[in-house]
Amino acid sequence: AHKKPPSELSKDLYSFINKLAKKFKKPATKLTIDSAEGALDNQFYNDYGVHLHKVAKLKKVDMIDRVQNIVAQGRFYYLDTEANKIFIEEHRNYRWDEKTLNSDDPKVIKEEDHTCDQFQYFVRDNERLLGLRY
């Protein structure tokens, strides 16, 4: 698979943010990104003068726990749109690798999980806003 360079990703991200802001008549308030994606942050800042908000990863089990907390409380809603079908499908199929379940650091199966990872970063970056206490 072709991985886009930061110069292309920056333009795509900017276009996506503007498209959603226009559609929902709401500006983006916090642009969360994996702290390991420094090159994209640098490119986005160079192109648009805006830094993305970098979030440090926790252990996968702790990232997932935060998402499960929000969902279990019935505090997560999504728009039932064509574009969101991939989000639901990926979360339905998200699962632990059985070979690692009894280890100190269980792993998930890393297939078709982009929206799962993104949602974990969103929740992690907005713990205070979401009223989570860890």
Where is each model-derived feature located?
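Mg2+-dependent endonuclease catalytic cores in nucleic-acid-processing enzymes, primarily RNase H-like
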Residues: 1-108, 129
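Histidine-centered active-site/metal-ligand motif
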Residues: 114
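Acidic two-metal-ion nuclease catalytic site recognized across multiple nuclease folds
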Residues: 124-134
